[in-house]
Amino acid sequence: MGGTWDLFRFPGIRSDSDLHTFGFPWRPWQSAKSLADGESIRTYIKECAEEFGIDRNIRFNHKVLSADWSSDEQQWTVSVEADGRQSTLKGRWIIWGTGYYDYNEPLKVDIPGLENFQGKVIHPQFWPEDLDYTNKKIAVIGSGATAVTLIPNLADKAAKVTMVQRSPSYVVSVPAVDPSAELMRKYLPSWMASQLIRWKYLMIPLIFFNVCRTFPNFAKNLVKRGMKAELPPSISVDPHFNPSYTPWEQRLCVCPDNDFFKSLGSGKADIVTGNIKTVTANSIITESGDTVDADIIVTATGLKILLGGHAKISVDGEPFDFADNYVWKGVMLQDLPNSCIVFGYANASWTLGADATAQMVCRMLKHMDSNNFSAAIPRVQRGESLKPKPLLNLNSTYIEKAKGALPKAGNKGPWVPRTNYFVDYWVARCGNLTQNMEFIARGHDKDL
């Protein structure tokens, strides 16, 4: 149990979103640390599941192989495998809570000469539990959230850790423990403090995001000044922390209590910026001539995006491809009956999107039950001209490479992409459920 937080075990794994909004609204996060480590998040998830009896409704060690919707039966047939044996389950609805990472393989990147390297090459997604990197020289290739998390945690034991990045990222330091949150917990009732803290963490990131998008140059200078103040004199902002894009064109990296910058100032960590020319038996050489000696190379170059967890999806035996279809109100998929994807936000805590999705699905189920409907299918109306838009409005490398795997958003109507939790929550609770939606009455067979 725990998904990413159980499967990913690299050193220092933690959230890069605050747990006050990343956690469940019905079971508020109570720890003092707003950015939590993987083990704490895993424990929190298990406690929530036990407290509300969710764990008693989970079939563990079951792998979903395929899911087929039958128009005749008005239900799904799901093929699963457990202990080497296959069986089927039937249900009216499917909620795809599989995340959006490929947990079988990482994102493939071309690193020239990597096959020449005689040391260990490790992807953070598949970190060996028995890896001893004490007094080793480690090169971490990448500049995203995983690399920023790894650097200070590896530097504690390694002889030297060098971050090798093709292009820089914005890194923002935040307090590990929020003093204002602690004051609220000290002087206010628990329920009130939890609500106020959650609202604070809902509003401040949203305001900052909109400032970044409205005043990009101001935001860029602001964040760069913050990074410059934290960097040691030996490391300059340019070129190592001078991205070619403005804040929130790609997701910002965060580090708790300056741990990333402190590791750079300790002398145990360093940073090299430039394209890799080649990898030798024991080093990385950049096009600018820098040589990074290494016993271990960590390829923190991004994650491969995948929806549906490798399950084959079909409607009446006809294969269904996520990438060929539009997303209805961020929840359901065009032409796919009684099914939803749990999708979050690039500019806020992912689980806020899951919360909005859950609200929408519960409301849809009640609407169908009260009207005696057996199926709901989002439809693009005949003659409706939609212009495709990206589901995630970021230009990060792993997002760009995933365009062929993600469904599409549209430019109008219920097909527009999600951007704002408050808007989506209102739509989920009060919005129109019938717009571009075909409902099938119980007892009426119909080809879908």
Model region roles, listed by residue range:
Residues D355, Q359-L448:
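C-terminal active-site-capping segments
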Residues S34-D102, L264, T278:
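Feature captures the FAD/FMN-dependent oxidoreductase FAD-binding
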Residues I296, A300-M368:
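Glycine/threonine-rich phosphate-binding loop and adjacent beta-strand/alpha-helix elements that clamp
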Residues G97-S236, A269, V292, F343-N393:
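Rossmann-like dinucleotide-binding core of oxidoreductases
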Residues M1-I58, Q165-R166, E230-I235:
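Beta1-alpha1 glycine-rich phosphate/pyrophosphate-binding loop at the start
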Residues W29-E50, R59, I141, V211-K220, ...:
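Short beta-strand to alpha-helix junction loop
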Residues A229-D293:
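Alpha/beta-hydrolase fold catalytic core
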Residues V64, T88-D102, I138-I141, V161, ...:
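Short hydrophobic core segments
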